[in-house]
A protein has these predicted regions:
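Short hydrophobic "helix-edge" motifs at membrane interfaces and signal-peptide entry regions
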Residues: 1-2, 171
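N-terminal helix-turn-helix DNA-binding core of bacterial DNA-binding proteins
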Residues: 2-39, 70
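Feature captures hydrophobic
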Residues: 38-80, 84-223
Length: 223
């Protein structure tokens, strides 16, 4: 789809996805790329440069780091309502997924950004996630760790080597449906599609930490 507006400005096919990542808190190139696994690094770099040229994004030095950061300009910030409306439309009108193209790593990257850090205990917590029911090509990526040190939350793909405080075992499709608001977490736990184990207090409080997708509350037709 050709770019609209100013030449090489905002491209309707990709830039809303990039802006979504920036609104979600990603600032560095690799963070943005991690949230957009189907976009090549070359294409992402080209679109970020185009957004800079259009006055939507600024590339700035990151204090104390060799890596640059991407920040929304005042003009870019005004896209927030547009991005939210597009996301709500997609949640309401696009067909439900069939479970064949689920990406556990992408799901966990989004979960990592949607934990209520203000509700977490003031201590370091390690949560291990084990997913089952993965599509064949993703079966190697079935275990993830979240390190919670409020207000920071880090996602690990390798065992951090520390004692696990809370263990989450879940069917991937069920967890994704919970994330999207299609299935209640309490129902998934009752049906044993999601199981929690570990420190009793953490098991009890985990449901209150999981904020779900920004669009989980959007009703679907006939829903």
């Amino acid at each position: 789809m050709p770019c609209g507006g100013r030449e090489r400005g905002v491209c309707p096919s990709l830039d809303p996805l990039i802006l979504r990542e920036l609104f979600a808190g990603s600032t560095r190139f690799n963070e943005i790329k991690r949230g957009l696994p189907l976009i090549s690094k070359t294409t992402l770099a080209q679109r970020l440069r185009a957004l800079e040229d259009a006055g939507v994004v600024d590339c700035v030095d990151s204090p104390g780091s060799a890596y640059a950061e991407y920040r929304l300009t005042t003009a870019g910030a005004e896209f927030q309502s547009v991005i939210h409306a597009l996301g709500a439309w997609g949640q309401r009108w696009t067909s439900r997924f069939d479970g064949k193209n689920l990406d556990a790593e992408l799901l966990m990257w989004n979960v990592r950004r949607r934990l209520a850090t203000d509700r977490l205990p003031a201590k370091r917590i390690l949560i291990r996630f084990d997913f089952f029911g993965l599509p064949p090509r993703y079966r190697k990526a079935r275990v993830f760790w979240l390190i919670l040190e409020p207000p920071e939350v880090d996602l690990c793909l390798k065992d951090p080597g520390a004692e696990v405080d809370l263990h989450v075992s879940a069917d991937l499709e069920t967890f994704a449906r919970v994330w999207l608001g299609d299935v209640a977490l309490a129902d998934a736990m009752q049906n044993k599609r999601i199981q929690l184990s570990g420190q009793r207090e953490l098991v009890r409080r985990f449901p209150s930490w999981l904020l779900l997708s920004h669009f989980a509350g959007v009703e679907r037709p006939g829903g």
